[in-house]
Every structure is written in structure tokens, then in C-alpha cells.
């Protein structure tokens, strides 16, 4: 009996992990002029309200995660600066 309960709980835990995958949304923009590239964030801590720092061709922006893959999170790092990137 205990092993059946354990198996059900384990299955529920695995399903919740699989179903909770979150991604940065895919950008609809494929290119951006260099003078328009701007970073609003460099890491997730720069964003508020549960949004993530996501990379786009026009810079890094805070976006709410989605369940569809395609976008990418900003790499951040010491060289990342907020504001316009020239």
C-alpha cells in the first residue's frame, strides 16, 4: 500500500516538473540597427514581478516567461551594461 502511494506521489512530482518548464518568449524581431540596441537588464535580478532578463536582437529586456521554447535568457556577465549599447 505504501509503495503505491509513493509511486503516485512520485508521478505527480515528475509531472509538475515537466509541466512547469518556463522559457523566455521568442522575439519577433530578427535584426536591429546598432544605434537602437539597448539593455534594460543584465540578469534576472534586474527585473521585477517574476519577469526574466531575456536576450533579443535589440538588447536585453524583462519579459514574463512562457511555456513555449524559442527565446533565450540574457547571459549577463561583467561586460553587460544597462542602457544603449554602441
UniProtKB/Swiss-Prot annotation:
Expressed by the venom gland. Contains 5 disulfide bonds. Residues 21-66 form the WAP domain. The keyword Methyltransferase does not apply. Its main location: secreted. One of its GO terms (molecular function) is toxin activity. Has antibacterial activity. This is U15-lycotoxin-Ls1e. It comes from Lycosa singoriensis.
Amino acid at each position: 500500500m505504501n509503495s503505491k502511494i509513493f509511486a503516485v506521489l512520485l508521478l505527480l512530482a515528475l509531472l509538475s516538473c515537466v509541466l512547469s518548464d518556463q522559457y523566455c518568449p521568442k522575439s519577433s524581431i530578427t535584426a536591429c540597427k546598432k544605434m537602437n540596441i539597448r539593455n534594460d537588464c543584465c540578469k534576472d535580478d534586474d527585473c521585477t514581478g517574476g519577469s526574466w532578463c531575456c536576450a533579443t536582437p535589440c538588447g536585453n529586456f524583462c519579459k514574463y516567461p512562457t511555456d513555449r521554447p524559442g527565446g533565450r535568457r540574457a547571459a549577463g556577465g561583467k561586460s553587460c551594461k544597462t542602457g544603449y549599447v554602441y
